[in-house]
Amino acid sequence: MSQLEHNIGLSIFEPVAKHRANRIVCTIGPSTQSVEALKNLMKSGMSVARMNFSHGSHEYHQTTINNVRAAAAELGLHIGIALDTKGPEIRTGLFKDGEVTFAPGDIVCVTTDPAYEKVGTKEKFYIDYPQLTKAVPVGGSIYVDDGVMTLRVLSKEDDRTLKCHVNNHHRLTDRRGINLPGCEVDLPAVSEKDRKDLEFGVAQGVDMIFASFIRTAEQVREVRAALGEKGKDILIISKIENHQGVQNIDSIIEASNGIMVARGDLGVEIPAEKVCVAQMCIISKCNVVGKPVICATQMLESMTSNPRPTRAEVSDVANAVLNGADCVMLSGETAKGKYPNEVVQYMARICVEAQSATHDTVMFNSIKNLQKIPMCPEEAVCSSAVASAFEVQAKAMLVLSNTGRSARLISKYRPNCPIICVTTRLQTCRQLNVTRSVVSVFYDAAKSGEDKDKEKRVKLGLDFAKKEKYASTGDVVVVVHADHSVKGYPNQTRLIYLP
Protein backbone atom coordinates (compact mmCIF):
# COMPACT_ATOMS: atom_id res chain seq x y z
CA MET A 1 0.00 0.00 0.00
CA SER A 2 1.33 3.43 -0.95
CA GLN A 3 1.40 6.44 1.39
CA LEU A 4 -1.44 7.98 -0.63
CA GLU A 5 -3.61 4.87 -0.31
CA HIS A 6 -2.85 4.80 3.41
CA ASN A 7 -3.88 8.45 3.76
CA ILE A 8 -7.17 7.83 1.95
CA GLY A 9 -8.02 5.16 4.51
CA LEU A 10 -7.47 7.39 7.54
CA SER A 11 -10.50 8.07 9.72
CA ILE A 12 -11.07 10.39 12.66
CA PHE A 13 -13.53 7.82 14.02
CA GLU A 14 -10.96 5.06 14.48
CA PRO A 15 -9.46 4.51 17.97
CA VAL A 16 -6.04 6.08 18.48
CA ALA A 17 -2.83 4.20 19.26
CA LYS A 18 -2.53 2.87 22.79
CA HIS A 19 1.04 4.08 23.18
CA ARG A 20 2.72 7.37 22.27
CA ALA A 21 5.85 6.81 20.21
CA ASN A 22 7.16 10.39 20.26
CA ARG A 23 8.88 11.84 23.29
CA ILE A 24 8.34 15.31 24.77
CA VAL A 25 11.10 17.62 26.01
CA CYS A 26 9.95 20.31 28.46
CA THR A 27 11.92 23.42 29.42
CA ILE A 28 11.86 23.97 33.17
CA GLY A 29 11.44 27.50 34.52
CA PRO A 30 9.59 29.50 37.17
CA SER A 31 6.24 27.92 36.27
CA THR A 32 7.45 24.35 36.70
CA GLN A 33 10.51 24.19 38.96
CA SER A 34 8.82 22.88 42.10
CA VAL A 35 8.67 19.14 42.82
CA GLU A 36 4.87 19.16 42.64
CA ALA A 37 4.83 21.01 39.32
CA LEU A 38 7.43 18.61 37.90
CA LYS A 39 5.40 15.60 39.01
CA ASN A 40 2.42 17.02 37.14
CA LEU A 41 4.53 17.50 33.99
CA MET A 42 5.76 13.91 34.22
CA LYS A 43 2.21 12.60 34.63
CA SER A 44 1.17 14.70 31.63
CA GLY A 45 3.86 13.17 29.41
CA MET A 46 7.25 14.85 29.89
CA SER A 47 10.18 12.59 28.97
CA VAL A 48 13.14 14.98 29.29
CA ALA A 49 13.60 18.07 31.47
CA ARG A 50 15.57 20.82 29.71
CA MET A 51 17.52 23.50 31.56
CA ASN A 52 18.28 26.61 29.52
CA PHE A 53 21.69 27.89 30.62
CA SER A 54 21.16 31.18 28.81
CA HIS A 55 19.28 32.07 31.99
CA GLY A 56 19.74 31.34 35.67
CA SER A 57 22.67 30.64 37.98
CA HIS A 58 24.23 27.29 38.79
CA GLU A 59 22.42 27.41 42.12
CA TYR A 60 19.10 27.83 40.30
CA HIS A 61 19.79 24.90 37.97
CA GLN A 62 21.01 22.79 40.89
CA THR A 63 17.58 23.22 42.44
CA THR A 64 15.97 22.15 39.17
CA ILE A 65 18.12 19.01 38.96
CA ASN A 66 17.39 18.07 42.57
CA ASN A 67 13.66 18.62 42.10
CA VAL A 68 13.50 16.64 38.83
CA ARG A 69 15.22 13.70 40.49
CA ALA A 70 13.00 13.92 43.56
CA ALA A 71 9.82 14.07 41.47
CA ALA A 72 10.93 11.19 39.23
CA ALA A 73 11.83 9.06 42.24
CA GLU A 74 8.41 9.64 43.80
CA LEU A 75 6.70 8.51 40.60
CA GLY A 76 9.13 5.67 39.85
CA LEU A 77 10.10 7.20 36.50
CA HIS A 78 13.41 7.65 34.66
CA ILE A 79 13.34 11.23 33.36
CA GLY A 80 16.25 12.54 31.28
CA ILE A 81 17.97 15.80 32.25
CA ALA A 82 19.34 18.02 29.47
CA LEU A 83 21.71 20.99 29.76
CA ASP A 84 21.15 23.47 26.93
CA THR A 85 24.26 25.64 26.51
CA LYS A 86 24.14 29.36 25.89
CA GLY A 87 26.63 28.92 23.09
CA PRO A 88 28.79 31.51 21.33
CA GLU A 89 26.89 34.70 20.58
CA ILE A 90 27.33 38.03 18.82
CA ARG A 91 25.77 40.98 20.64
CA THR A 92 25.57 44.75 20.58
CA GLY A 93 27.28 46.83 23.23
CA LEU A 94 25.71 49.32 25.63
CA PHE A 95 24.00 52.55 24.62
CA LYS A 96 24.87 55.84 26.25
CA ASP A 97 21.24 56.40 27.22
CA GLY A 98 20.28 52.74 27.61
CA GLU A 99 18.24 52.64 24.39
CA VAL A 100 17.93 54.17 20.93
CA THR A 101 14.91 54.36 18.62
CA PHE A 102 15.54 53.86 14.91
CA ALA A 103 13.24 54.66 11.99
CA PRO A 104 13.22 53.30 8.41
CA GLY A 105 15.79 55.13 6.30
CA ASP A 106 18.10 56.05 9.18
CA ILE A 107 21.83 55.67 8.54
CA VAL A 108 23.92 54.13 11.31
CA CYS A 109 27.49 52.86 11.59
CA VAL A 110 28.25 49.62 13.40
CA THR A 111 31.76 49.14 14.71
CA THR A 112 33.97 46.60 16.42
CA ASP A 113 36.06 49.37 18.00
CA PRO A 114 36.04 48.73 21.79
CA ALA A 115 36.01 52.50 22.38
CA TYR A 116 32.28 52.43 21.52
CA GLU A 117 31.41 49.36 23.60
CA LYS A 118 29.61 51.32 26.34
CA VAL A 119 28.74 54.57 24.57
CA GLY A 120 26.55 53.58 21.61
CA THR A 121 24.40 56.24 19.96
CA LYS A 122 21.89 56.53 17.14
CA GLU A 123 24.80 57.33 14.82
CA LYS A 124 27.18 54.54 15.86
CA PHE A 125 27.06 51.48 18.10
CA TYR A 126 29.27 48.53 18.97
CA ILE A 127 29.05 44.86 17.89
CA ASP A 128 31.31 42.38 19.71
CA TYR A 129 32.45 40.30 16.71
CA PRO A 130 35.98 41.33 15.62
CA GLN A 131 35.60 39.74 12.15
CA LEU A 132 32.39 41.66 11.36
CA THR A 133 33.76 43.74 8.49
CA LYS A 134 35.31 40.65 6.87
CA ALA A 135 32.23 38.48 7.31
CA VAL A 136 29.52 40.82 6.01
CA PRO A 137 29.88 42.14 2.44
CA VAL A 138 28.53 45.40 1.08
CA GLY A 139 24.89 44.71 0.25
CA GLY A 140 24.67 42.08 2.98
CA SER A 141 22.32 42.15 5.95
CA ILE A 142 22.79 42.41 9.70
CA TYR A 143 19.86 41.27 11.85
CA VAL A 144 19.65 42.97 15.23
CA ASP A 145 17.65 41.89 18.30
CA ASP A 146 16.98 38.37 16.97
CA GLY A 147 15.97 39.69 13.57
CA VAL A 148 13.46 42.30 14.71
CA MET A 149 15.58 45.10 13.22
CA THR A 150 17.32 44.72 9.84
CA LEU A 151 20.34 46.66 8.60
CA ARG A 152 21.59 46.67 5.01
CA VAL A 153 25.32 47.32 4.60
CA LEU A 154 26.00 50.34 2.36
CA SER A 155 29.77 50.57 2.59
CA LYS A 156 32.86 49.58 4.51
CA GLU A 157 34.15 52.74 6.21
CA ASP A 158 37.33 51.17 7.62
CA ASP A 159 38.58 47.82 8.96
CA ARG A 160 36.29 48.13 11.99
CA THR A 161 33.23 49.98 10.72
CA LEU A 162 30.30 49.33 8.38
CA LYS A 163 27.86 52.01 7.25
CA CYS A 164 24.29 50.67 7.22
CA HIS A 165 20.75 51.55 6.17
CA VAL A 166 18.00 50.88 8.75
CA ASN A 167 15.13 48.99 7.12
CA ASN A 168 12.47 49.22 9.82
CA HIS A 169 11.35 50.97 12.98
CA HIS A 170 12.71 49.57 16.26
CA ARG A 171 13.61 50.57 19.80
CA LEU A 172 17.01 49.00 20.50
CA THR A 173 18.30 48.37 24.02
CA ASP A 174 21.60 47.08 25.46
CA ARG A 175 23.24 43.71 24.68
CA ARG A 176 20.87 42.58 21.90
CA GLY A 177 21.61 39.52 19.79
CA ILE A 178 23.09 39.81 16.29
CA ASN A 179 22.60 37.42 13.36
CA LEU A 180 24.60 37.51 10.14
CA PRO A 181 22.47 35.54 7.65
CA GLY A 182 24.37 33.86 4.85
CA CYS A 183 27.77 34.78 6.30
CA GLU A 184 30.58 32.47 7.37
CA VAL A 185 30.95 33.10 11.10
CA ASP A 186 34.06 31.91 12.93
CA LEU A 187 33.20 31.53 16.61
CA PRO A 188 34.38 28.89 19.10
CA ALA A 189 31.85 26.16 19.91
CA VAL A 190 32.55 26.46 23.63
CA SER A 191 32.68 29.87 25.28
CA GLU A 192 34.22 30.36 28.71
CA LYS A 193 30.74 30.39 30.23
CA ASP A 194 29.85 27.20 28.35
CA ARG A 195 32.99 25.53 29.67
CA LYS A 196 32.01 26.28 33.27
CA ASP A 197 28.44 25.19 32.60
CA LEU A 198 29.61 21.90 31.08
CA GLU A 199 31.86 21.24 34.07
CA PHE A 200 28.84 21.85 36.30
CA GLY A 201 26.74 19.49 34.18
CA VAL A 202 29.33 16.72 34.36
CA ALA A 203 29.59 17.11 38.14
CA GLN A 204 25.80 16.89 38.44
CA GLY A 205 25.52 13.87 36.15
CA VAL A 206 23.26 15.34 33.47
CA ASP A 207 22.26 12.90 30.75
CA MET A 208 22.62 15.01 27.61
CA ILE A 209 23.93 18.32 26.31
CA PHE A 210 21.95 20.40 23.84
CA ALA A 211 24.91 22.15 22.18
CA SER A 212 23.90 25.54 20.77
CA PHE A 213 24.91 27.10 17.44
CA ILE A 214 26.83 24.10 16.11
CA ARG A 215 28.26 24.93 12.68
CA THR A 216 30.75 22.12 12.02
CA ALA A 217 31.61 18.60 13.15
CA GLU A 218 34.81 19.97 14.67
CA GLN A 219 32.71 22.07 17.04
CA VAL A 220 30.93 18.91 18.21
CA ARG A 221 34.33 17.45 19.00
CA GLU A 222 35.20 20.63 20.94
CA VAL A 223 32.13 20.09 23.11
CA ARG A 224 33.09 16.44 23.61
CA ALA A 225 36.61 17.46 24.65
CA ALA A 226 35.19 20.00 27.11
CA LEU A 227 33.12 17.25 28.75
CA GLY A 228 36.31 15.30 29.46
CA GLU A 229 36.72 11.72 30.59
CA LYS A 230 34.09 12.02 33.32
CA GLY A 231 31.51 13.18 30.78
CA LYS A 232 32.34 10.67 28.04
CA ASP A 233 28.95 8.94 28.30
CA ILE A 234 26.87 12.14 28.13
CA LEU A 235 24.94 12.47 24.86
CA ILE A 236 25.62 15.49 22.65
CA ILE A 237 22.56 16.72 20.78
CA SER A 238 23.74 19.34 18.28
CA LYS A 239 21.41 22.28 17.69
CA ILE A 240 21.18 23.36 14.05
CA GLU A 241 20.50 27.11 14.11
CA ASN A 242 22.23 28.64 11.09
CA HIS A 243 22.99 28.11 7.42
CA GLN A 244 26.47 26.72 8.16
CA GLY A 245 24.93 24.03 10.34
CA VAL A 246 22.53 23.10 7.55
CA GLN A 247 25.35 23.13 5.01
CA ASN A 248 27.51 20.79 7.13
CA ILE A 249 24.65 18.66 8.42
CA ASP A 250 25.98 15.26 7.27
CA SER A 251 29.28 15.54 9.14
CA ILE A 252 27.56 17.10 12.18
CA ILE A 253 25.11 14.18 12.37
CA GLU A 254 28.00 11.72 12.18
CA ALA A 255 29.86 13.47 15.03
CA SER A 256 26.79 13.88 17.26
CA ASN A 257 24.60 11.55 19.30
CA GLY A 258 21.52 13.37 18.03
CA ILE A 259 20.25 16.56 16.41
CA MET A 260 17.87 19.35 17.34
CA VAL A 261 16.19 21.42 14.63
CA ALA A 262 16.19 24.73 16.54
CA ARG A 263 13.81 26.67 14.34
CA GLY A 264 13.97 29.98 16.22
CA ASP A 265 17.43 31.19 15.28
CA LEU A 266 17.36 29.04 12.15
CA GLY A 267 14.36 31.04 10.92
CA VAL A 268 16.38 34.23 11.37
CA GLU A 269 19.56 32.94 9.74
CA ILE A 270 17.79 31.49 6.69
CA PRO A 271 14.55 32.68 5.04
CA ALA A 272 11.61 31.62 7.22
CA GLU A 273 9.89 29.92 4.28
CA LYS A 274 12.90 27.58 3.90
CA VAL A 275 12.76 26.33 7.50
CA CYS A 276 10.17 23.66 6.64
CA VAL A 277 12.48 22.30 3.92
CA ALA A 278 15.48 22.29 6.27
CA GLN A 279 13.39 20.59 8.95
CA MET A 280 12.23 17.78 6.68
CA CYS A 281 15.71 17.26 5.21
CA ILE A 282 17.49 17.16 8.59
CA ILE A 283 14.91 14.86 10.18
CA SER A 284 15.08 12.47 7.22
CA LYS A 285 18.89 12.34 7.32
CA CYS A 286 18.74 11.49 11.04
CA ASN A 287 16.13 8.79 10.40
CA VAL A 288 18.33 7.07 7.81
CA VAL A 289 21.31 6.79 10.16
CA GLY A 290 19.25 6.13 13.30
CA LYS A 291 20.18 9.25 15.27
CA PRO A 292 17.44 10.77 17.48
CA VAL A 293 16.15 14.14 16.27
CA ILE A 294 14.23 16.81 18.18
CA CYS A 295 11.98 19.44 16.60
CA ALA A 296 11.89 22.63 18.67
CA THR A 297 10.72 26.25 18.99
CA GLN A 298 7.27 27.86 18.88
CA MET A 299 5.46 24.55 18.63
CA LEU A 300 2.54 25.51 20.90
CA GLU A 301 3.67 29.01 21.80
CA SER A 302 0.19 30.53 22.04
CA MET A 303 -0.42 28.26 25.04
CA THR A 304 2.08 30.33 27.01
CA SER A 305 -0.93 32.52 27.75
CA ASN A 306 -3.93 30.70 26.21
CA PRO A 307 -5.56 27.45 27.38
CA ARG A 308 -5.81 26.02 23.84
CA PRO A 309 -3.42 25.97 20.86
CA THR A 310 -4.11 27.47 17.46
CA ARG A 311 -5.05 25.09 14.65
CA ALA A 312 -1.80 26.00 12.90
CA GLU A 313 0.21 24.97 15.98
CA VAL A 314 -1.58 21.63 16.14
CA SER A 315 -0.69 21.03 12.51
CA ASP A 316 2.91 22.07 13.17
CA VAL A 317 3.36 19.48 15.93
CA ALA A 318 1.65 16.81 13.82
CA ASN A 319 3.83 17.68 10.84
CA ALA A 320 6.99 17.21 12.93
CA VAL A 321 5.74 13.73 13.84
CA LEU A 322 4.91 12.97 10.20
CA ASN A 323 8.36 14.20 9.14
CA GLY A 324 9.86 11.55 11.44
CA ALA A 325 10.96 13.47 14.56
CA ASP A 326 11.69 11.37 17.63
CA CYS A 327 10.92 14.23 20.01
CA VAL A 328 9.04 17.50 20.07
CA MET A 329 10.04 20.26 22.46
CA LEU A 330 8.33 22.93 24.53
CA SER A 331 10.19 26.09 25.57
CA GLY A 332 8.44 29.08 27.15
CA GLU A 333 5.18 27.14 27.15
CA THR A 334 6.35 25.11 30.16
CA ALA A 335 9.10 27.39 31.50
CA LYS A 336 6.95 30.46 32.12
CA GLY A 337 3.51 29.66 30.71
CA LYS A 338 0.17 29.74 32.47
CA TYR A 339 -0.86 26.25 31.34
CA PRO A 340 2.20 23.96 31.56
CA ASN A 341 0.30 20.73 32.23
CA GLU A 342 -2.34 21.40 29.62
CA VAL A 343 0.24 22.15 26.93
CA VAL A 344 2.06 18.86 27.55
CA GLN A 345 -1.23 16.96 27.49
CA TYR A 346 -2.23 18.65 24.23
CA MET A 347 1.14 17.85 22.68
CA ALA A 348 0.89 14.22 23.77
CA ARG A 349 -2.58 13.86 22.23
CA ILE A 350 -1.47 15.47 18.97
CA CYS A 351 1.49 13.08 18.74
CA VAL A 352 -0.73 10.04 19.23
CA GLU A 353 -3.18 11.21 16.57
CA ALA A 354 -0.37 11.96 14.11
CA GLN A 355 1.02 8.44 14.59
CA SER A 356 -2.05 7.03 12.88
CA ALA A 357 -1.18 8.96 9.72
CA THR A 358 2.32 7.50 9.44
CA HIS A 359 2.71 4.50 7.14
CA ASP A 360 5.11 2.41 9.19
CA THR A 361 5.88 -0.27 6.61
CA VAL A 362 6.68 2.34 3.97
CA MET A 363 9.04 4.00 6.45
CA PHE A 364 10.64 0.64 7.32
CA ASN A 365 11.23 -0.26 3.68
CA SER A 366 12.53 3.21 2.81
CA ILE A 367 15.07 3.18 5.64
CA LYS A 368 16.17 -0.40 4.95
CA ASN A 369 16.61 0.24 1.22
CA LEU A 370 18.97 3.14 1.98
CA GLN A 371 21.35 1.05 4.13
CA LYS A 372 24.76 -0.01 2.90
CA ILE A 373 25.39 -3.70 2.37
CA PRO A 374 26.87 -5.58 4.13
CA MET A 375 25.24 -4.45 7.39
CA CYS A 376 26.92 -4.96 10.73
CA PRO A 377 25.56 -8.13 12.42
CA GLU A 378 23.81 -6.20 15.21
CA GLU A 379 21.87 -4.03 12.78
CA ALA A 380 20.96 -7.01 10.61
CA VAL A 381 19.47 -8.79 13.62
CA CYS A 382 17.58 -5.68 14.77
CA SER A 383 16.15 -4.83 11.35
CA SER A 384 15.07 -8.44 10.83
CA ALA A 385 13.38 -8.40 14.23
CA VAL A 386 11.37 -5.33 13.22
CA ALA A 387 10.38 -7.06 9.97
CA SER A 388 9.17 -10.01 12.03
CA ALA A 389 7.22 -7.67 14.31
CA PHE A 390 5.36 -6.27 11.30
CA GLU A 391 4.66 -9.73 9.89
CA VAL A 392 3.22 -11.19 13.12
CA GLN A 393 1.60 -7.89 14.16
CA ALA A 394 3.48 -7.94 17.46
CA LYS A 395 2.07 -5.80 20.24
CA ALA A 396 5.54 -5.03 21.62
CA MET A 397 9.23 -5.62 21.10
CA LEU A 398 11.57 -6.45 23.97
CA VAL A 399 15.33 -5.91 23.85
CA LEU A 400 18.07 -6.49 26.43
CA SER A 401 20.61 -3.69 26.03
CA ASN A 402 22.89 -2.13 28.61
CA THR A 403 24.16 0.74 26.44
CA GLY A 404 20.87 1.28 24.58
CA ARG A 405 22.49 0.77 21.18
CA SER A 406 20.31 -2.19 20.21
CA ALA A 407 17.17 -0.34 21.32
CA ARG A 408 18.17 2.62 19.12
CA LEU A 409 18.78 0.32 16.16
CA ILE A 410 15.34 -1.23 16.55
CA SER A 411 13.80 2.24 16.83
CA LYS A 412 15.62 3.26 13.66
CA TYR A 413 13.45 0.85 11.66
CA ARG A 414 10.25 2.36 13.08
CA PRO A 415 8.20 -0.59 14.38
CA ASN A 416 4.56 0.27 15.01
CA CYS A 417 4.65 -1.00 18.58
CA PRO A 418 6.47 0.00 21.79
CA ILE A 419 10.08 -1.10 22.27
CA ILE A 420 10.71 -2.21 25.85
CA CYS A 421 14.41 -1.98 26.70
CA VAL A 422 15.56 -3.82 29.81
CA THR A 423 18.90 -2.39 30.93
CA THR A 424 21.20 -2.59 33.94
CA ARG A 425 22.18 1.10 33.61
CA LEU A 426 20.02 3.93 34.95
CA GLN A 427 21.73 6.43 32.66
CA THR A 428 20.66 4.36 29.66
CA CYS A 429 17.06 4.47 30.92
CA ARG A 430 17.17 8.26 31.01
CA GLN A 431 19.05 8.75 27.74
CA LEU A 432 16.65 6.56 25.77
CA ASN A 433 13.95 9.14 26.48
CA VAL A 434 14.92 10.93 23.25
CA THR A 435 14.45 7.80 21.13
CA ARG A 436 11.13 7.10 19.44
CA SER A 437 8.95 4.29 20.85
CA VAL A 438 11.48 3.16 23.48
CA VAL A 439 10.31 2.56 27.05
CA SER A 440 13.05 1.60 29.52
CA VAL A 441 12.94 -0.84 32.41
CA PHE A 442 15.78 -0.90 34.95
CA TYR A 443 17.10 -4.31 36.01
CA ASP A 444 19.03 -3.98 39.26
CA ALA A 445 21.72 -6.61 38.71
CA ALA A 446 23.57 -5.73 41.92
CA LYS A 447 20.44 -6.22 44.00
CA SER A 448 19.36 -9.44 42.29
CA GLY A 449 22.84 -10.89 41.87
CA GLU A 450 21.70 -12.24 38.52
CA ASP A 451 23.58 -10.06 36.04
CA LYS A 452 23.91 -12.83 33.44
CA ASP A 453 20.45 -14.34 33.82
CA LYS A 454 18.82 -13.23 30.58
CA GLU A 455 15.59 -15.10 31.23
CA LYS A 456 14.99 -13.11 34.41
CA ARG A 457 15.41 -9.91 32.44
CA VAL A 458 13.12 -11.14 29.69
CA LYS A 459 10.49 -12.01 32.30
CA LEU A 460 10.85 -8.55 33.84
CA GLY A 461 10.22 -6.97 30.44
CA LEU A 462 7.24 -9.19 29.67
CA ASP A 463 5.70 -8.50 33.07
CA PHE A 464 6.19 -4.78 32.47
CA ALA A 465 4.49 -5.01 29.06
CA LYS A 466 1.49 -6.67 30.65
CA LYS A 467 1.36 -4.33 33.64
CA GLU A 468 1.49 -1.19 31.46
CA LYS A 469 -1.06 -2.73 29.03
CA TYR A 470 1.27 -2.62 26.05
CA ALA A 471 0.34 -6.26 25.47
CA SER A 472 -2.12 -8.79 26.87
CA THR A 473 -2.17 -12.54 27.41
CA GLY A 474 -1.87 -14.30 24.05
CA ASP A 475 -0.29 -11.33 22.24
CA VAL A 476 2.99 -11.81 20.39
CA VAL A 477 6.11 -10.04 21.70
CA VAL A 478 9.34 -10.05 19.66
CA VAL A 479 12.37 -10.51 21.94
CA VAL A 480 15.91 -9.56 20.88
CA HIS A 481 19.04 -10.45 22.87
CA ALA A 482 22.42 -12.19 22.72
CA ASP A 483 23.06 -15.76 23.77
CA HIS A 484 25.79 -16.59 26.26
CA SER A 485 28.39 -17.30 23.56
CA VAL A 486 28.25 -13.82 22.02
CA LYS A 487 29.38 -10.55 23.55
CA GLY A 488 28.73 -7.05 22.26
CA TYR A 489 25.65 -7.48 20.09
CA PRO A 490 22.36 -9.41 19.97
CA ASN A 491 22.19 -12.53 17.82
CA GLN A 492 18.84 -14.01 18.77
CA THR A 493 15.25 -13.11 17.93
CA ARG A 494 12.39 -14.95 19.61
CA LEU A 495 8.63 -14.69 19.19
CA ILE A 496 6.88 -15.17 22.52
CA TYR A 497 3.17 -15.44 23.22
CA LEU A 498 2.59 -13.41 26.36
CA PRO A 499 1.48 -15.84 29.10
Swiss-Prot record:
Per the UniProt entry, the Enzyme Commission number(s) are: 2.7.1.40
Copy the pathway line from the protein's UniProt record.
Carbohydrate degradation; glycolysis; pyruvate from D-glyceraldehyde 3-phosphate: step 5/5
Which positions are annotated as binding substrate? R50, G264, D265, T297
* Protein keywords: Allosteric enzyme, ATP-binding, Glycolysis, Kinase, Magnesium, Metal-binding, Nucleotide-binding, Potassium, Pyruvate, Transferase
Activity modulation comment: Activated by fructose 2,6-bisphosphate, activated by the effector in a cooperative manner.
Q: Name one GO molecular function term.
A: pyruvate kinase activity
**Sequence positions that bind Mg(2+):** E241, D265
| Residues that, per the record, bind ATP | N52, F53, S54, H55, R91
In this UniProt entry, which residues are annotated as the site Transition state stabilizer? Answer: K239
EC top class named in words? transferase
Annotated catalysed reactions: pyruvate + ATP = phosphoenolpyruvate + ADP + H(+)
Q: Which domain of life is it from?
A: Eukaryota
**What does the record note on quaternary structure?**
Homotetramer.
Protein family membership: Belongs to the pyruvate kinase family.
**Designated name of the protein:** Pyruvate kinase 2
Q: Which gene encodes it?
A: PYK2
